[in-house]
């Protein structure tokens, strides 16, 4: 699996052989917590799509997933995320089903139904 930092507010996931790598276009580009958030959504979505594709006997050739986000203020936070999957080998008749499957990602559901977060000092 390869995660590429495609911008300050974007990542791309591409399935590759071997261990997961995180790549940046330059050494000064840092993998931020926001890149981690986008990566977790991309990886989770890939996982459910890959599982579905395996059971449906569909090829994932050429698949990639892009996630972009924007910020809001007061308080400073991620305001929205946009996930786009590119799947050239997906039969057009399966596109709507693939979108439904992608929405079943647990990270996606967590973002739609935020958990309670407790902060404590030890």
Predicted regions located by residue number:
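Alpha-helical metal-binding/catalytic segments enriched in His/Glu/Asp
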Residues: 44
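Extended beta-strand/beta-hairpin segments
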Residues: 1-39, 49-122
């Amino acid at each position: 699996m390869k995660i590429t930092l495609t911008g300050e507010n974007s990542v791309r996931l591409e399935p590759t052989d071997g261990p997961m790598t995180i790549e940046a276009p330059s050494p000064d580009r840092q993998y931020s917590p926001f890149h981690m958030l986008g990566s977790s959504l991309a990886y989770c979505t890939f996982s459910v799509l890959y599982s579905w594709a395996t059971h449906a006997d569909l090829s994932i050739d050429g698949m990639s997933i892009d996630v972009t986000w924007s910020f809001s203020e007061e308080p400073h936070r991620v305001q929205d995320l946009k996930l786009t999957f590119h799947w050239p080998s997906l039969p057009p008749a399966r596109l709507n089903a693939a979108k439904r499957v992608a929405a079943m990602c647990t990270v996606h559901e967590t973002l739609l139904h935020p958990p309670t977060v407790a902060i404590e000092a030890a």
